[in-house]
Swiss-Prot record:
It comes from the Bacteria. Zn(2+) binds at H566, H570, C668, H672. The lineage of its organism: Bacteria, Bacillati, Bacillota, Clostridia, Eubacteriales. It catalyses: tRNA(Ala) + L-alanine + ATP = L-alanyl-tRNA(Ala) + AMP + diphosphate. This is Alanine--tRNA ligase. Coiled coil: none annotated. It is found in: Cytoplasm. SMART domains: tRNA_SAD. CDD domains: AlaRS_core (cd00673). Keywords: Aminoacyl-tRNA synthetase, ATP-binding, Cytoplasm, Ligase, Metal-binding, Nucleotide-binding, Protein biosynthesis, RNA-binding, tRNA-binding, Zinc. Catalyzes the attachment of alanine to tRNA(Ala) in a two-step reaction: alanine is first activated by ATP to form Ala-AMP and then transferred to the acceptor end of tRNA(Ala). Also edits incorrectly charged Ser-tRNA(Ala) and Gly-tRNA(Ala) via its editing domain.
Length: 879
C-alpha cells in the first residue's frame, strides 16, 4: 500500500468509475434543490433522489460523484474528538436501473485492492444476514477471504426509510490492528472501538416496501454507494484522525501559525485548532454555494459556525479578524476539485470578514461583561448564572446562548434556564431553526434535562392507577411556564404520579390529569436524563398553574394490556431457555398495549417445532394461573434467588424481582398483571433474524391473540370457499390445481411455439445483409420466453451463418433476444451489445454473451424503433 493524498484518492476513485462507463458529475450545491426535507445536503445520494425515485431522468444510467456534505447534528463534539466534523466529502458510484451486484462488488474489490492497493488480509466485508446472492458474488467473483465476510442484521446492513425503495447493503472495512478477526461478535467489538473502520457502503436497492410491510422486488434495481473521502484518506496515509490528513493538516497548520502555537502540545489549544479548521472548511463551501449569515435556517447554521470559530480564535490569543485569512489554504487544498471556491475566493473572504467584524464588535464588550459575571460568581462561591444576565448578553450583545454555555462550562458554571427561558420567548423560533434535537409536540427535548434537581418526582403506580398530586413544573413552547391553558400542548411534572414512564422496553402510560374545571390528556410519559417523570399533555379544558392539586388517572385498560404483554415477555424468555437452551439471553424488547417484541441471543432460526413448543409452554404456564409476585431486595439477594438480570442494565442498591411461579424469576421495574392467567392466550406472530447471533420474536396476547387467530381462520374459510372444498382439503385441492396449471402451461407453451412458427417464413423472406453478414430481424406480438428462443434457434439454424434479433410485445412489456453464429462473432458481432443498445430505446436493459443475449423493456410503443436500430448497430460492430 502506497500513501496517497486526499486529492489523489478522490481523483483515482472518479477516474476508475469513469473507466467503467460512469458519467462524472461535479458536486451539487450543499443547498438542496426542491427538497424541503433537508436544510443542507448531508449525504452523497441526497441530490440524486429525483433520479432514484424516477421524478427525473438521469443524464446517464451510470453516474459517479464526490459530493460536498454538511452535518451539524454533532457540532458540540467537533473539536473535542478527533473524528467529528461538520464538513466532509462523500464519493459514490450510482446505477439507475443499469448494473447491479454482479458488477459493483467486483469493481469495489478491484478499486480497493488494485488501485488503492490495500492489503487483502486487512479487509473485512459485512453483508445482510439473508443476502446469499451478495455472499456468492463476493466469494466467486473476488478473492476476498471467505472467513473475512460477516453477516449482520437489518440495523447494520439493510437500508430502508419507511415505505418505498430499500434493500440490503454490503460494507468494506479496514482492520488497523495486527492479527485476524475471527467472529462477527469480535468484529462488532473492533468496529465499535474504531479498529475495524468501515470505508465503503454498497447499497443494493432491490425492493419496494409497501404500506403493508411487504418487500416487492424492483424490476430495475439501483445501486447507491458511499465512501467517505476523509476516512479513506486516513487509511491511505496511515493516520488516526482526519485532522492529520494532508489537506486538512495543511489548513490546521495555517491556523496554528496564526495562533503562534503547535498542534499536539496542548489539548485545550488543539480543541480550538480543530474547531477552527473544520468550521472554516464548512463556511467556505457554504458561502461558495450562496448561503449567507442570517438568524434562521441554513443562514443561522453558517452564522453559528463562524461565531464559534471566531470565539476559539480569541481563546488561542489571535488578535482581530482572522478567519478570512485561512480561506486561501482551504482553496489551495480543495479549489481544483471545487472550482467555485476559486471563482468566489474574494466573495467568500468578504462575507467571512464582514460577519467576523460584526461579531468582534459585540464579543469584546460581551466577553468583558461575562468575565465580570464569572468573577462575581467565583467571589461569592456560586455555580449558577442567572437567566436574566444570560439573556441580556444574548439580546443586547448578540452573544449566542450556546457560546455562553460553552464558556461557562469551562469554568464549571451552569445557566439558570428557568429564568432564561421566561425572558426569551420571542427568540424561540431562531433557536429551534438551528437545533437538531428532536421535538415532541413542539417541546424541545433538551429543556427537559434542565428541570431543577430539587424537584422530586415519585412513581406510585404499581398499586395505584389514580392519585392526587401537586403540579411542580410546567413546560410549554420550549420554556418553563407558570400555567398551561386549553388548546395548549406541553409537559406537566408532579411530585407523585401513577404514570409509568417509558423504560426497559415498556412504553409509557396514557390517561388524564384533571382538577376542578381542568382536563388534560396524557399522551406519553417519559423520564428525563435526571430520572424525573414528565407527562406530555394536551389540555382539553380549563387551565392549571404551578402548585395546584390535580388528579392523575392512568388508562386502566391500556395499562392492563401492556401488563399482559410484559408478563408474557417474561414467560417467553423462560420458555426459550427451556426449549432452545440456557445460552438464550434477552438482547432487547419492546412492549406496548397491542403486541410484544423480544430479541434474544441464538445463532439460527427456530424450527416450526421449536416455535410450537415455546408457544405451548407459555400457554400451559398461563393455564397454571400462578400469581405474579414482586419483591424488593438487594442485587446479591436477587441473584441468589436465581433471578435473571440484563448484563447491560444499571441497577441500584435495591432491585425489584418479578416471580411467576417456579417458571420465571427476573429483575424488572416494569408493570405486570397480578396473575399469569389474565394473559389469556399467547400467540407468536413472527420469528426472524435481526443480526448475526440475534433473533426476534413478535407475539400478541389476550384479545389481540384471538383477533390474530380469527383473522387466520377467516382467511382459511375464504380460501376454502374459493377452492370449493372443505378447510381440511385445501392442501390437496391446491396440489391438484398446481398439477393442472402445469399441464395448461405446457399446452400454452406449445400453442405459442406454433404461433411463433407462423412468423418464421416471413422473417426468412426478409433477411438483410450488413457488410456481408446475414441479419434476420422482426418485431412480434405475444411470443415470449421459450417460444421466442425456440423461434430464434430455428431461424439461426436455417440461415446457418448470420445474426438473428427478435423483439416481442408481451403483456405491456418488451422482450428481446439476439443470436449469432460463431463465424460472425469473429467478425465483431456481439449479441450482448446489440440487445443492450436496443433495450435502452424501449426503456429497459440487459446483455449477455457475444453469441447469445436477451433483454427487456417497459415501452412496447418503442419496439419497432428498437428493431429498426439493429441494422445501424450492426454497421458499427462488423469489421
Amino acid at each position: 500500500m502506497e500513501k496517497m493524498g486526499l486529492n489523489q484518492v478522490r481523483e483515482a476513485y472518479l477516474k476508475f468509475f469513469e473507466s467503467k462507463g460512469h458519467l462524472r458529475l461535479p458536486s451539487f450545491s450543499v443547498v438542496p434543490k426542491n427538497d424541503k426535507s433537508l436544510l443542507l445536503i448531508n449525504a452523497g445520494m441526497a441530490p440524486l433522489k429525483p433520479y432514484f425515485t424516477g421524478l427525473q431522468t438521469p443524464p446517464r444510467k451510470r453516474v459517479t460523484t464526490c459530493q460536498k456534505c454538511i452535518r451539524t447534528g454533532d457540532i458540540e463534539n467537533v473539536g473535542k474528538t478527533s473524528r467529528h466534523a461538520t464538513f466532509f466529502e462523500m464519493m459514490g458510484n450510482f446505477s439507475f436501473g443499469d448494473y447491479f451486484k454482479n458488477e459493483v462488488i467486483p469493481w469495489a474489490w478491484e478499486f480497493t485492492t488494485e488501485v488503492l492497493k490495500l492489503p487483502k488480509e486487512k479487509l473485512y466485508v459485512t453483508i445482510y444476514l439473508d443476502d446469499d446472492e451478495a455472499y456468492d458474488i463476493w466469494t466467486s467473483k473476488t478473492d476476498v477471504d471467505p472467513k473475512h465476510i460477516f453477516r449482520l442484521g437489518k440495523e447494520d446492513n439493510f437500508w430502508e426509510h419507511g415505505v418505498g425503495p430499500c434493500g440490503p447493503c454490503s460494507e468494506i472495512h479496514f482492520y488497523k490492528d495486527n492479527g485476524e478477526i475471527k467472529s462477527a461478535e469480535e468484529f462488532i467489538e473492533k468496529s465499535d472501538a474504531d479498529r475495524a473502520v468501515e470505508f465503503w457502503n454498497l447499497v443494493f436497492t432491490q425492493f419496494d416496501k409497501d404500506e403493508d410491510g411487504n418487500y416487492n422486488r424492483l424490476e430495475f434495481p439501483n445501486i447507491d454507494t458511499g465512501m467517505g473521502l476523509e476516512r479513506m484518506a486516513t487509511i491511505m496515509q496511515g493516520v488516526e484522525t482526519i485532522f492529520e490528513v494532508d489537506t486538512i493538516k495543511s489548513i490546521l497548520d495555517k491556523v496554528a501559525a496564526l495562533a503562534n502555537t503547535k498542534y499536539g502540545e496542548d489539548e485545550l489549544k488543539d480543541v480550538s485548532l480543530r474547531i477552527i479548521t473544520d468550521h472554516v472548511r464548512s463556511v467556505s463551501v457554504m458561502i461558495s454555494d450562496e448561503v449567507l449569515p442570517s438568524n434562521e435556517g441554513r443562514g443561522y447554521v453558517l452564522r453559528r459556525l463562524l461565531r464559534r470559530a471566531a470565539r476559539h480564535g480569541k481563546l488561542l490569543g489571535i488578535k482581530g479578524t482572522f478567519l478570512y485569512k485561512i480561506v486561501d489554504s482551504v482553496i489551495e487544498n480543495s479549489g481544483e476539485a471545487y472550482p467555485e471556491l476559486k471563482e468566489k475566493k474574494d466573495y467568500i473572504k468578504k462575507v467571512i470578514s464582514i460577519e467576523e467584524e460584526r461579531f468582534a464588535e459585540t464579543i469584546d464588550s460581551g466577553m468583558e461583561i461575562l468575565k465580570e459575571y464569572i468573577e462575581d460568581l467565583e467571589k461569592n462561591n456560586k455555580k449558577v448564572l442567572s437567566g436574566e444576565k444570560v439573556f441580556k448578553l444574548y439580546d443586547t450583545y448578540g452573544f449566542p446562548l450556546e457560546l455562553t454555555e460553552e464558556i461557562l462550562e469551562e469554568k464549571g458554571i451552569t445557566v439558570d434556564m428557568d429564568s432564561f427561558n421566561k425572558e426569551m420567548k420571542e427568540q424561540r423560533e431562531r433557536a429551534r431553526a438551528a437545533r437538531s434535537e428532536s421535538t415532541y409536540m413542539g417541546t424541545d427535548v433538551k429543556i427537559l434535562d434542565t428541570i431543577p434537581s430539587e424537584i422530586e418526582t415519585t412513581f406510585d403506580g404499581y398499586e395505584n392507577l389514580e392519585l392526587q398530586s401537586k403540579v411542580k413544573v410546567i413546560i410549554k413552547d420550549d420554556a418553563f411556564a407558570d400555567c398551561i391553558n386549553k388548546g395548549e400542548k406541553g409537559i406537566i411534572v408532579t411530585d407523585r404520579t401513577p404514570f409509568y414512564a417509558e423504560m426497559g422496553g415498556q412504553i409509557g402510560d396514557k390517561g388524564t390529569i384533571s382538577a376542578d374545571g381542568f382536563m388534560a390528556k396524557v399522551q406519553d410519559c417519559k423520564n428525563n436524563i435526571g430520572g424525573k417523570i414528565v407527562h406530555f399533555v394536551e389540555v382539553t379544558e380549563g387551565s392549571i398553574k404551578l402548585e395546584d392539586e390535580v388528579l392523575l388517572e392512568v388508562d386502566r385498560k391500556r395499562r392492563e394490556n401492556i401488563g399482559k404483554n410484559h408478563s408474557a415477555t417474561h414467560l417467553l424468555h423462560a420458555a426459550l431457555r427451556k426449549v432452545v437452551g440456557e445460552h438464550v439471553h434477552q438482547s432487547g424488547s419492546y412492549v406496548d398495549e397491542d403486541k410484544l417484541r423480544f430479541d434474544f441471543t441464538h445463532f439460527e432460526s427456530l424450527t416450526h417445532e421449536e416455535l410450537k413448543k415455546v408457544e405451548d409452554l407459555v400457554n400451559d404456564t398461563i393455564e397454571s394461573v400462578w400469581d405474579v409476585v414482586t419483591k424488593e431486595m438487594t442485587i446479591e439477594e436477587a441473584k441468589n434467588s436465581g433471578a435473571m438480570a440484563l448484563f447491560d442494565e444499571k441497577y441500584g442498591d435495591k432491585v425489584r424481582v418479578v416471580k411467576m411461579g417456579d417458571f420465571s424469576t427476573e429483575l424488572c421495574g416494569g408493570t405486570h398483571i397480578s396473575n399469569v392467567g389474565k394473559i389469556g392466550l399467547f400467540k407468536i406472530v413472527s420469528e426472524s433474524g435481526i443480526a448475526a447471533g440475534t433473533r426476534r420474536i413478535e407475539a400478541v396476547t389476550g384479545h389481540k391473540a384471538l383477533e390474530f387467530i380469527e383473522h387466520k381462520s377467516d382467511l382459511l374459510r375464504q380460501i376454502a370457499s374459493m377452492l370449493k372444498c372443505s378447510e381440511k382439503d385445501i392442501i390437496n385441492r391446491l396440489n391438484q390445481q398446481n398439477a393442472e396449471l402445469k399441464d395448461k402451461d405446457k399446452e400454452i407453451s406449445a400453442l405459442k411455439s406454433k404461433l411463433a412458427s407462423g412468423s418464421e417464413d416471413d422473417i426468412l423472406k426478409n433477411i438483410k445483409e450488413v457488410k456481408g453478414v446475414k441479419l434476420a430481424v422482426a418485431a412480434l406480438k405475444d411470443v415470449d420466453g421459450e417460444a421466442l428462443r425456440n423461434l430464434g434457434d430455428k431461424i439461426k439454424n436455417k440461415i446457418e451463418s448470420g445474426v438473428v434479433v427478435l423483439g416481442s410485445e408481451v403483456e405491456g412489456k418488451v422482450q428481446f433476444i439476439a443470436m449469432a453464429s460463431k463465424d460472425v462473432v469473429s467478425k465483431g458481432v456481439h449479441c450482448g451489445t446489440i440487445v443492450r443498445e436496443i433495450a435502452k430505446i424501449a426503456g429497459g436493459g440487459g446483455g449477455g454473451r457475444p453469441d447469445m443475449a436477451q433483454a427487456g423493456g417497459r415501452l412496447p410503443e418503442k419496439l419497432n424503433d428498437a428493431i429498426n436500430e439493429v441494422e445501424n448497430i450492426m454497421e458499427n460492430l462488423v469489421k
